[in-house]
C-alpha cells in the first residue's frame, strides 16, 4: 500500500513539474512615472503599478495587450531567455535579448505593445 501511495505521489509531482517547465511566462509591469527624492527624480519605479500583464511564449512569438494610456515605462522579466521588440513588429530571436529572470526597464509609448519570443 505504501508503495502505491509513493508511486502516486511521484507521478503527481512529475506531472506538476513538467507542466511548470512547459510554461515560458513573461511578466510585464507598467508604470506611469519615476520616484522622487529631494525635489528631483530618481531612477526607480513609482508604485503602484498602472497595470500588469503576462504572456506565454511557449507557442512562439506573442504580443502584449496595448499599454495603458498613462504608462510611460515598463518592467519586463522572462522565465527563459527572450528577445523583445517594441515597435509594433513581431519579435524575432535576433532582436534585443533579455536573459532569464533579469528585470529590464524600457520607456514606451502609451497604447504601444511589446512583442516577445523565447530565444534560448
Task: Give the label of every model feature segment.
Residues 57-64, 92-109:
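Short, solvent-exposed S/T- and G/P-enriched segments that are highly enriched in secreted/extracellular
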Residues 71-74, 104-119:
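Noncatalytic modules at the cell exterior or secretory-pathway interfaces
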